[in-house]
Amino acid sequence: MNNNIINLIAAIILSLSIIFGWQYFVVKPEQKKQQQQIAVQKAENLKKQQLKAVVEPATGIVVQEESQVQRIKIESESLTGSISLKGLRFDDLILKKYKQDLSKNSPEVRLFSPANTENAYFAEVGLVSNLSSVKLPNNDTIWNSDSEILSPEKPVHLFWVNEDGVKFLVTITVDENYLFTIEQTIVNNSDKELPVQSYGLINRKYIAVEKAVNILHQGPIGCIDENLKEYSYDDIKDKKSEKFVASKVDWIGITDKYWLSSLIPDKSSNYSSNFNYALKQGTERYQVDFISPVQIIKPGEDFSIKSRIFAGAKKVDLLDKYEKQYDIKLFDRAIDFGWFYIITKPVFYAMNFFYGYVGNFGVSILIVTVIIKLLMFTLANKSYRSMKKMKNLQPEIDRIKNLYSDDKARLNQEIMALYKKEKVNPVAGCLPILVQIPVFFSIYKVLYVTIEMRQAPFYGWIKDLSASDPTTIFNLFGLLPFSPPLFLMIGAWPILMAITMFLQQKMSPEPADPMQAQVMKFMPLIFLFMFSSFPVGLLIYWSWNNILSIIQQYYINKFN
């Protein structure tokens, strides 16, 4: 095997080693450090006093003093919580279908919390005016409601009348999932023109979160002028504000690993939008907001505008549905499928399709792996044949190297002539590896970022395919009463992966180059430690892929 091929393989191995090494030695310790920071921050937050309102809506960060005001209760199949009638704020929302962890008494996931709470996070829509003389509903307005409960079967109608007789009507509906629709109507019963602008905002108190560096996006996000905009919390903190003027805003919001809160404005006009950061009384806050152009409402006329709020789990089929139903461009990209989006999403679709039949995502992974293996069988067959031919040609290649050791150009010319004569492709042996790399990372992404894989069980001790194997050989898989350090958490599935990788190597043609052969012998051991902290679903895929490769190699050896 010539130096170019050796360098190619070495580059692939080095790249994988850097990526997995970064995950193992940097990301995991960083996550542990951040978990400690979260605990410290929570303790400090308990000592802080409640915050009062400091900034006007839609112009910056909004913090409102919470008081005992009337609320509209939210009840649906997916959500519970309430909407504050003071300022019409969505600030109390719990996701009924998701628990915080796998413990028996785990509470449900809370998404929104009132402004003065420890994890303040809320959304609101409303109206502002460039004239101070125009009396509009604001953060202190107490709305009147025709109902105390909002449900998919029962919309809520709100109203408020200012001192000039201008009537403001709001109709709120919620579907069975996570989408609120808010229709605002202004009936100008006064004798003056009303210049108004509609706005929407999502405001969040920053809390240290677990970050998987360069693996997924968390923070402000949106689709503006049909382009996906992603900003980390640090980006916005450094810039203080990122502004877009008179732009087409399909949606803007704040995303977590599994959860999304998003504003979806009316498509009737362009909007100015902002991604903001502010530090108030020692508290960091982030806000995304939009504001419409000025709309003049003449006396005796009325004006209506509709906007939506998505607040919930980032389910792939749900985001796809809303994207198609309401023409919300790139809404599915709120899920960070990564560089291999065109592969990752079809891989998820395939897994989800088979899950519909077998009811287990682990089994679905096994089925998809078989299909991928069958699709790649012809390529693998050619690859194994090429590797075998390369090994048989090695003595002749060595002879040519000795003969033309002082003439590099002639050496390469003679070797290429030999390849052509024997009909050997020197890179054919690398093709299955190169093809598997995007498939591998696609499955990793699916396991890591999709809500469908969160807390999805397999069989036996595997209760969450998106988490690492909870067992370790260093306490005899739980028989000994102690927990080894993180770097010794080498469970049954990482060991099975390493064993199957070793057996696969034994059945495959040994690389012709002695140095490469020595490197390959150590790969199962290296991968054992690197993969031990990865999602166990990925290890199930890799182990099963190795087993199928062993069967495939047996077939090729027998019939070729």
From Swiss-Prot:
Query: Could you confirm whether the keyword Thylakoid appears in this record?
Result: no
Biological process (GO) annotations? protein insertion into membrane; protein transport
The record lists the membrane-crossing segments as 5-25, 334-354, 357-377, 431-451, 476-496, 522-542
Q: Which UniProt keywords apply?
A: Cell inner membrane, Cell membrane, Chaperone, Membrane, Protein transport, Transmembrane, Transmembrane helix, Transport
Query: Membrane topology per the record?
Result: Multi-pass membrane protein
The UniProt entry's coiled-coil ranges are none
| Pfam families (UniProt xref) | 60KD_IMP, YidC_periplas
Write out the annotated subcellular location: Cell inner membrane
InterPro entries per UniProt: Membr_insert_YidC (IPR019998), Membr_insert_YidC_N (IPR028053), YidC/ALB3/OXA1/COX18 (IPR001708), YidC/Oxa/ALB_C (IPR028055), YidC_ALB_C (IPR047196), YidC_periplasmic_sf (IPR038221)
Which PANTHER family does the entry link to? CYTOCHROME C OXIDASE ASSEMBLY PROTEIN COX18, MITOCHONDRIAL, OXA1
Q: Which family does it belong to?
A: Belongs to the OXA1/ALB3/YidC family. Type 1 subfamily.
- NCBIfam families, sorted: PRK01318.1-4, yidC_nterm, yidC_oxa1_cterm
Protein name from the UniProt record: Membrane protein insertase YidC
Q: Per the UniProt entry, what species is this protein from, by scientific name?
A: Rickettsia africae (strain ESF-5)
The protein's gene is named yidC
